[in-house]
């Protein structure tokens, strides 16, 4: 009973400290999301899960002295960097937006004091327009980034570069495929052509030979039938000539013409 009574205050103390720890974590996150000076604070989005504080400090300290660097862990994917001078923050936004930091291409913007989402968060609800909010692109008040003229120019340049890169890739792939086709045609051995020619020639010769043999046999039989018909018709013609009537006058064997004997007169 005494041991159980002693363990209860320890459990209560641990629960209290854990709740205080999580409360401070949430307070810190809320401070970084909502509090602080928005002119010196920079939002870094699209970070990887393994982003380190030292890498961010090296990348952003190039533009000026830093106050603090805070990286979100639950959920991960974004961070906040606070400068001492607002001009250094603007230079960092212009220089590091779209660069590769911690193994991923990050998005760097000036903090406006409104909550942002990472890749793992749900999109926040829209709030009404505030004239004190600043643009992420030019840093001026009165409009947002999607209405900024710089953002439209950058988007047009990106679309043009993408279209140029796509057209170049298509041209390169087409030229490469054509060169491959030429290589395959030139690299094809001549033996295959000779073999195909031989095969086609042999097939044509076989066909012509078979046709000539059949034709010769046909013509031979036809010529034989014609010769037989001619040989049979020739003796008939000779017989018809022999049977034709002889001339009326026939000479005697002595050569004198044969005359019919007149009847002798009886004295």
UniProtKB/Swiss-Prot annotation:
Q: Which GO terms describe its biological process?
A: cellular response to leukemia inhibitory factor; mRNA processing; mRNA transport; negative regulation of mRNA splicing, via spliceosome; RNA splicing
Matching entries from Pfam families are given as:
RRM_1
Q: How is it modified after translation?
A: Extensively phosphorylated on serine residues in the RS domain.
Cite the repeat ranges for sequence: 182-189, 190-197, 198-205, 206-213, 240-247, 248-255
Cross-link position, Glycyl lysine isopeptide (Lys-Gly) (interchain with G-Cter in SUMO2)? 53
Residues annotated with N6-acetyllysine modification: 53
Residues bearing the modification Phosphoserine: 61, 192, 194, 196, 210, 212, 221, 223, 225, 260, 262
Compositional bias (Basic residues): 152-209, 223-251
Instruction: Write out the GO cellular component annotations.
Output: cytoplasm; nucleoplasm
Keyword Hydrolase tagged: no
Start and end residues of each stretch annotated as Sufficient for interaction with NXF1: 110-127
The ranges of region (Disordered) come to 152-267
InterPro entries registered for this protein in UniProt: Nucleotide-bd_a/b_plait_sf (IPR012677), RBD_domain_sf (IPR035979), RRM_dom (IPR000504), SRSF7_RRM (IPR034651), Znf_CCHC (IPR001878), Znf_CCHC_sf (IPR036875)
Q: Where in the cell is it found?
A: Nucleus; Cytoplasm
* Keyword DNA-binding part of the UniProt annotation: no
What the record says about family reads: Belongs to the splicing factor SR family.
Which proteins does it associate with, and in what oligomeric form? Found in large molecular weight complexes containing CCNL1 and the p110 isoforms of either CDC2L1 or CDC2L2. Interacts with CCNL2 and CPSF6. Interacts with NXF1. Interacts with YTHDC1.
Question: What's the protein called, per UniProt?
Answer: Serine/arginine-rich splicing factor 7
Q: Which organism is it from?
A: Mus musculus (Mouse)
């Amino acid at each position: 009973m005494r041991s159980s009574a002693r363990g209860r205050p320890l459990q209560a103390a641990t629960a209290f400290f854990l709740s205080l720890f999580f409360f401070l974590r949430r307070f810190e996150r809320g401070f970084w999301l909502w509090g602080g000076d928005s002119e010196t604070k920079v939002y870094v989005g699209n970070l990887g899960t393994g982003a380190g504080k030292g890498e961010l400090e090296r990348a952003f300290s190039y533009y000026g002295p830093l106050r603090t660097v805070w990286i979100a862990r639950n959920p991960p994917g974004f961070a906040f960097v606070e400068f001492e001078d607002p001009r250094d923050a603007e230079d960092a936004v212009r220089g590091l937006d779209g660069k590769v930091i911690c193994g991923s291409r990050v998005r760097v913007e000036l903090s406006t004091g409104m909550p942002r989402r990472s890749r793992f968060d749900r999109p926040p609800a829209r709030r009404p327009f505030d004239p004190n909010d600043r643009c992420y692109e030019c840093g001026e008040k009165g409009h947002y980034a999607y209405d900024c003229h710089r953002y439209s120019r950058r988007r047009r340049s990106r679309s043009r570069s993408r279209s140029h890169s796509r057209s170049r890739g298509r041209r390169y792939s087409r030229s490469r495929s054509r060169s491959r086709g030429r290589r395959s045609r030139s690299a094809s051995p001549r033996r295959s052509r000779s073999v195909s020619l031989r095969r086609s020639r042999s097939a044509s010769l076989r066909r012509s030979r078979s046709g000539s043999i059949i034709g010769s046999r046909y013509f031979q039989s036809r010529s034989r039938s014609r010769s037989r018909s001619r040989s049979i018709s020739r003796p008939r013609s000779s017989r018809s000539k022999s049977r034709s009537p002889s001339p009326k006058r026939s000479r005697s064997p002595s050569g004198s013409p044969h005359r019919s004997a007149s009847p002798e007169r009886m004295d």
